């Protein structure tokens, strides 16, 4: 069974580019254009059980990355989360939220490697 990735990014171009990269190496990807939409997707039990990794942007309208991740954790989701940001100082906003923080930009192979690493951690946690 393939593990789905949930991409949360208000930038359509960035989301589509990352989706194409990840689908190109055999991953299934869902896109949410903001945090609230992602939480709605995850509120469906069938959808939620197939999501194995969340990749989210830091700066988004309506619900910022830290607000989204805090709400995700408050709702009991323990799945791995990667936060992408161009702002090095943003990492401190995620203290205590159990995320992997990565600075943008990075090349496609780095994204693929990161996903493989995070999903590997996920598999070891559930084993």
Predicted features, each with a name:
Residues 31-53:
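Acidic, metal-coordinating helix/loop segments flanking the phosphotransfer/catalytic sites
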Residues 57:
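Active-site residues of response regulator receiver
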Residues 60:
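Receiver (REC) domain active-site loop signature in two-component systems and cognate sites
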Residues 82-85:
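Hydrophobic/aromatic residues positioned on beta-strands within the core alpha/beta folds
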Residues 106-119, 123-124:
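C-terminal output helix
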């Amino acid at each position: 069974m393939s593990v789905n990735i949930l991409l949360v990014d208000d930038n359509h171009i960035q989301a589509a580019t990352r989706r194409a990269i990840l689908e190109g190496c055999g991953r299934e990807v869902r896109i949410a254009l903001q945090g609230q939409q992602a939480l709605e997707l995850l509120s469906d039990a069938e959808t939620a059980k197939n999501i194995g990794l969340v990749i989210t942007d830091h700066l988004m309208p309506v619900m910022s990355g830290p607000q989204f991740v805090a709400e995700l954790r408050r709702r009991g989701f323990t799945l791995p989360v990667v936060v992408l940001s161009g702002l090095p100082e943003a990492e401190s906003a995620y203290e205590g939220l159990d995320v992997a923080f990565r600075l943008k930009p990075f090349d496609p192979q780095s994204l693929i490697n990161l996903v493989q690493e995070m999903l590997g951690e996920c598999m070891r946690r559930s084993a």
